[in-house]
C-alpha cells in the first residue's frame, strides 16, 4: 500500500466517529448562562417535556439537569425515558437527535452538553373519508384490552460537563 492509502485508512475511524456524532438537528452553541439561574434548553412538545438546566457553582456538581413536564393537561404522543435504562445507540435503532451546548457565564472554559436521542417509530395513520385521522374511544379500549397498543416514539437525554473547571 502506498503512504497515501495508509493515511486515508488512518482517517477512517475519525470520520466514522464524526458521522456518528452528527445530530438530526443542527444548532449553534447557546448563550452563556449565569450561576443559579434555571434556563430552558429545549422543549419536546410530543413528549410533554421541557429540558432545564442550572449552573450551580459547585465544583462537585457544576450543572443540574432535569426533565420537567410542561403541563398536567398535556397528552404525550411520545415518551421520555431514563437514559441509563434505555442505553440508546444507533445499533439499537436510536438516532442522535440534538446536541445542546451551553457555556457557563462564570467559567467560560466550562460548558454543559446535553445529547438528546430519539427512537423513531413507524406510525401509519388510517385516514377516514374526510382525510382525517380519528381515534374512536370504544375501538381504542378494545385494542388496549387485546394488547394491541401502538408503539410511540421515545426520547432520552444525557448531560455531561465538558471543559476545564474554574478555581
Go through each PLM region and give its residues.
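Bacterial N-terminal signal peptides that target proteins for export
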Residues: 1-8
Amino acid at each position: 500500500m502506498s503512504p497515501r492509502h495508509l493515511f486515508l485508512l488512518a482517517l477512517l475511524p475519525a470520520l466514522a466517529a464524526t458521522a456518528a456524532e452528527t445530530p438530526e438537528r443542527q444548532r449553534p452553541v447557546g448563550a452563556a448562562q449565569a450561576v443559579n439561574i434555571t434556563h430552558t434548553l429545549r422543549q419536546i412538545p410530543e413528549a410533554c417535556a421541557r429540558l432545564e438546566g442550572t449552573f450551580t457553582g459547585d465544583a462537585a456538581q457544576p450543572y443540574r439537569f432535569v426533565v420537567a413536564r410542561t403541563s398536567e393537561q398535556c397528552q404525550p404522543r411520545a415518551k421520555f425515558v431514563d437514559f441509563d435504562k434505555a442505553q440508546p445507540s444507533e445499533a439499537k435503532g436510536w438516532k442522535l437527535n440534538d446536541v445542546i451546548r451551553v457555556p457557563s457565564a462564570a467559567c467560560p472554559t466550562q460548558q454543559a452538553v446535553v445529547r438528546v436521542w430519539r427512537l423513531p417509530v413507524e406510525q401509519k395513520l388510517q385516514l377516514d373519508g374526510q382525510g382525517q385521522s380519528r381515534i374512536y374511544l370504544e375501538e381504542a379500549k378494545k385494542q388496549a384490552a387485546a394488547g394491541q397498543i401502538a408503539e410511540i416514539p421515545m426520547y432520552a437525554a444525557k448531560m455531561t460537563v465538558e471543559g476545564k473547571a474554574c478555581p
